[in-house]
């Protein structure tokens, strides 16, 4: 099995994933992907876009207008090219599904009262799934490499 990793992914931040793939005989080829971070060769029917934390996806969805628009452009592009996009949110808060997001507390609230909170984030995720055909998935950083392979198969 050969996995394509977007060349814009920072190599040193994904060593845990690379170690897992190496142990399991998964070859990793780095190349620029049109959308997302990971796909299987030769098909781009399924793509995984990884988020390093709940805070990152909260910024993508409820952060600045520019950040939100960039995220939506990526979702639309995946939809236009016929790829199923999985947004995989790595987290250590025990969040395993969108329903768990409702009880998530945004640590940025300490600095900004306007930041998106769990209930609004969960509602936005459901809306985005319905509108753009993507799926939000959740796992721990330790599970990410295996989850990426499972989603792409």
Give the role of each language-model region.
Residues 46-52:
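Conserved catalytic cores of phosphodiester-cleaving nucleases, focusing on short active-site segments
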Residues 1-43, 57-153:
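Non-catalytic C-terminal interaction segments of nucleic acid-processing enzymes
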């Amino acid at each position: 099995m050969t996995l394509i990793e977007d060349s814009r992914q920072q190599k040193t931040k994904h060593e845990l994933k690379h170690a897992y793939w190496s142990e399991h005989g998964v070859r990793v080829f780095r190349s620029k992907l049109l959308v997302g971070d990971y796909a299987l060769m030769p098909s781009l029917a399924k793509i995984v876009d990884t988020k390093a934390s709940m805070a990152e996806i909260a910024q993508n969805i409820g952060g600045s207008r520019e950040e939100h628009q960039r995220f939506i452009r990526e979702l639309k592009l995946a939809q236009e090219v016929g790829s199923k996009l999985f947004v995989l949110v790595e987290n250590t808060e025990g969040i395993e599904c969108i329903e768990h997001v409702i009880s998530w507390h945004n640590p940025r609230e300490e600095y900004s009262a306007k930041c998106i909170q769990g209930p609004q984030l969960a509602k936005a995720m459901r809306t985005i799934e319905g509108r753009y055909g993507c799926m939000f998935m959740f796992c721990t950083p330790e599970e990410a490499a295996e989850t990426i392979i499972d989603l792409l198969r």
